[in-house]
C-alpha cells in the first residue's frame, strides 16, 4: 500500500464559516446538555438584533457602488475606477418597496440628505509608503481584479454582520497581505478598506448601535488583513509508511473544534464532574451515567481527589468489564483494534503495518495489553498527556489521511459500534486488488443500458463506500459489438469497418429522410421527442430536409439544442452528463481518467458547446461515422452486456415454461429415472478407487553420490514447489547456488525444499499477490502435500505468518513431526491423498484440481469440528 493511496469516499464539505447561533448550539450539543440561561440569552440577543443586522446589510449593499467608488478614488488616480466594476450574474435584486425604503434610510444616514457633501471628504489616514496608483499604468486587467476584490471585501462584511460572527472575515482575509503585495500594494488596500469603513459608518450617523456593529466587523477585516499569514498545521510522522499531514490554518478557524477537557487541581466539583462525563462519552461513546444510570464510583472518587490522573482513569475504563462487554466480546479482533483506536487515540488506523502491530498484541496478549500499548504510546503522550481527556481528531482538528478517508469518517459516526465488520483491514486489502471494469470515478456514473434516457443507479441502494484505486493510465475493458479482432485498440485502422450485428442508419440518395430523422432523434435523445419539444427543433429539421447540413452537423445541432441540454446537461452532475453524452455521440463509454479529464478541461474552460464540438469533430467520430451516418453503439460495458443476457435468458425461460405442457405426477413416477445403457453399466462395474494412487511416483535419494539421480530429484523438487518446470529460470542466481550445493551432497532433500521455499521467486509468486489464508493453502500443498486440515490449523499458521513471516512458517512445516514421519530427509513432498478413502481428500482434491494463478477463491475446509488442533 503506497503513501499516495487515496480512499476517495465519502464527500466531506469543509465548513467555511461560523454563525453566532451555531456556535452556541454546537457547544451544548457536544457537551450533551440543554442550553443554559446565558446561552439562551445570547441567542435571544442575536435573534432580536436580526432585523437590525439585515437592515444594515441592505443599506450597505444598496450603497455598495458609492462605498467602492470612494475607496477606489482614494487609491487610484488618472481615471474612473468604478467603470471597471463587474457585478456577478447571480446578484440579488431588491423589490421596488425594499429599494425605496432602503434608499430613504440610506439617504437620511448620510447627514442631512446631502450625499455629495461628504463625497470628497477623506477621513482615513494613509500609512507609511502609500502612493496613489495610476489607472493607465496599472492596466485594465489589474483594475478589474482590484475593484472586484474591494467588492468582495464589502460583501464579506455584510455576510459576517448577518451571521453575527467574524470567522468568515478571518477565513477569507487572513494572510492576503503577502499575496496583494506581490500584485500591487498592500498599503493601498489598507487605505481602501479604511475608507470603506468610514463611508459605511457615515451611512448610519443617527444610529449609534448600528455604527458599533459596522465598526466591529470592519476593524476585524482590517486587522486580519494586516496580520501575517499563518502557516499550515503540519503533523510530523515517525514512520516512513505513514502519510504526511498538513492542514491550512483557515480550516481550523472555520471548523467546529472538539472540546478539550483538562483535569486541574483548582477545578470545582461541577467542573470535575464534566471532565468525568467527557471521559465516559469518549470511551463508551455515550454518557453512561445519564443514559443507563451506570458509573464507576471508586474510580471517579480517585480522579476527583487527584489520586490518579485522567490517563490512568481512561486506562481503567478500557480495562473495565463494561468496556469488554460492549466493545470486545461481540466483535472480531480486527474490529476491536479499530474501535480501540477511536476510543483511546481519537482517530482510525493509519496503515496496514500499524494494524498488524496492534492486532498481534491483541491476539497474543489480550485486550488489556492492547489498551496499555495504545495509552503508553508516544503519540498519546504528545496529544493528551496525563491530564487531557482524549477527543475525536476529525476534520478541522488536524489533517486527515486520504488513504483511510472513508473508513475514518465512518468510524467517527454514532453507529460505529453497531458495525461488526472490520473496515480498515478490508480497505487496506482493496488497495492490492486490480481495479474492476467500471467507471474510473465511481460505478454510479455509468448509465443503465436502457432506452429511457439518462438513468443511473441510486447511491442509496446497496451503498458501498469501499474505494477503487484507478491509476492515471488505467483503461477499463469494453465489449465490442462485432468481432473482437476489429476493436479500435487492437486494430486502429478498422475504425471505418462497422460491426456486423448492428443496424446502421446511413444517408444516401435512395434513403428516406424521415427514417434518418427518426434514427437521429432516437440516437441523440434516447427516445422519440414529444410534439412540444419538436416545435423548437423544427427549423433545424427543415434545414436538414433541404440538405443544407450533413447528418454529422444535424446530430451536433441536436446535441446543442435547449431540449437536449435541459434533459442531459443542466439537471445532471457534470461527470454523469459527460459520460452519457459521450455514449450517445461516440457510441462507447469513456476509457479512463485521461480521456474524461480532457473533457473536464474542455467543459470548464470553453463550455458545453465546445465539448459537443470536440466529440462531433473528433477523429474517432469522423472515422467511424463520417458525415452521413447516424452514430450507433459500438462498445458496451461488461455489466451492460451481462444484464442484457440475463434479461434475454429470463424472457426465454418464461416463454419456454409457458409453452411446456404439464405432465401429471403419476406419469412422472412411472418413468425410470435413467436408462440402463451399456456404457452406464460399464461405468458402474469399474467404479471404486481409481488407479491414481498406484500410479504416483515418489522421488527419493538413496545415494548422494549419484549426480544423475540427484539432478532428477532437484527438478522434481522445483516442480513440486512451483507447480511447473522452471528450468529456464535457474541458469543463474540463487537457484544455481542451491543446485550446486545439492549436487555436491552438502544439503539433503529436506534442506533443499527449505531453501527453495525461502527463495525470492517463491515469495514473489505465492506470497505477495495473495492473502494470508491462501498463502497457507499453497504452503501446505507444496510442503506437506495436502490441503489444510481445519480452521484451527489455518489460525495457527496465520498467527505464525503475521508475526514471524513466510520463512519461519515454512520452517515450522518442514520441521514438523508430520513432515519428518511422511517424507523424512530424503523424499520430495508429493500429493498424499490422490484418491478415496482419505480423511482430507475433498479439500486436497479441490486444491489440486483448480488453476492456481487464475483462481483467487479460498478453499474452505469441510470439517466443522476442531478436534485435530495443531
Curated annotation (Swiss-Prot):
Keywords: Antenna complex, Bile pigment, Chloroplast, Chromophore, Electron transport, Lyase, Membrane, Photosynthesis, Phycobilisome, Plastid, Repeat, Thylakoid, Transport
Disulfide bond sites: none
Membrane topology, as annotated: Peripheral membrane protein
Keyword Electron transport: yes
GO biological process entries: photosynthesis
Top-level division of the source organism's lineage: Eukaryota
InterPro entries xrefs: Globin-like_sf (IPR009050), PBS_linker_dom (IPR001297), PBS_linker_sf (IPR038255), Phycobilisome_asu/bsu (IPR012128), Phycobilisome_asu/bsu_sf (IPR038719)
Protein purpose: This protein is postulated to act both as terminal energy acceptor and as a linker polypeptide that stabilizes the phycobilisome architecture. May have intrinsic bilin lyase activity.
Xref: PANTHER family: PHYCOBILISOME 32.1 KDA LINKER POLYPEPTIDE, PHYCOCYANIN-ASSOCIATED, ROD 2-RELATED
Entry protein name: Phycobiliprotein ApcE
